[in-house]
Regions:
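N-terminal intrinsically disordered/low-complexity leader segments
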Residues: 1-21, 92, 96
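Alpha-helical structural segments
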Residues: 21, 25-32, 51, 68-88, ...
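Amphipathic alpha-helical segments used for helix-helix packing
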Residues: 115-132, 182-190
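Amphipathic C-terminal alpha-helical segment
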Residues: 154, 174-192, 206-210
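Helix-turn-helix
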Residues: 25, 36-68, 72
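Amphipathic alpha-helical packing segments from all-alpha helical-bundle domains
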Residues: 97, 125, 132-158, 167-172, ...
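Hydrophobic alpha-helical connector segments
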Residues: 86-120, 142-145, 162-163, 170-173
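Short, flexible, glycine-rich and Lys/Arg-enriched loop motifs at helix boundaries
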Residues: 33-40, 126-137, 192
């Protein structure tokens, strides 16, 4: 394992770039290890360091503890999901679904992301003490909500839940999608992934038609 003096060399800009690259590599490493292990609980800082070819103390230079590391992973996960939702809602990139029913487009994006990254998706929605629905909500998670809200508003502008508040229709639709996806990921729904996927399209259609 390289020692501290060997790790980062070069001028200031090169060192900054190297630090950013190593941080990204650590986040990628923990995600890969978690998917292999079936969850984040058993992944250790030592394993993460070994995955990128460093000693464990290097990880602590970037993240004081495992929780801080998982918070960073969660933030990256929501940022990636937001990009997927943005692409799904863009008529130029996804003309058939985005124009016919934007809710189908975002449901498809959410399903694809969750099933490709099951452990990450579950971490994003189960890590404790991550604020949602408050002024302290992470920007990446808030962007996901706003993109989903844009699709809900476009597809169902007069949804009856809006009588409660402007965010209520979005919360309800997200809850439907998340519920079906979570049941599918845990093997708790009849018919497995195939039936769960069709239920998402059904939810998107019925929610629009309310």
């Amino acid at each position: 394992m390289p020692d501290r003096a060997q790790r980062i060399k070069g001028n200031s800009r090169q060192r900054t770039d190297a630090h950013s690259q190593l941080r990204a590599a650590l986040l990628t490493a923990v995600r890969e290890l978690a998917e292999q292990a079936g969850g984040y609980e058993s992944v250790t800082m030592r394993q993460i360091a070994a995955q990128v070819g460093y000693a464990a103390p290097v990880v602590y230079e970037y993240f004081p503890g495992k929780r801080q590391l998982l918070l960073a992973v969660t933030d990256v996960g929501f940022a990636e999901l937001a990009d997927r939702l943005a692409e799904a809602g863009c008529p130029k990139r996804n003309p058939r679904r985005a124009e016919a029913n934007p809710l189908m487009a975002v449901a498809d994006a959410l399903w694809t992301f969750a099933t490709a990254n099951p452990c990450l998706y579950q971490l994003m929605h189960t890590l404790v003490d991550v604020p949602f629905g408050t002024g302290d909500t992470p920007a990446s998670a808030l962007r996901c909500f706003e993109l989903l809200k844009s699709a809900v508003t476009a597809a169902a502008p007069d949804h009856p839940a809006k009588a409660q508040d402007d965010d209520a229709p979005t919360d309800l639709f997200w809850a439907q999608l998340h519920g079906v996806i979570t049941l599918a990921l845990h093997g708790r729904i009849k018919g497995g992934h195939a039936r769960a996927r069709s239920l998402l399209d059904h939810a998107a259609t019925t929610f629009r038609d309310h």
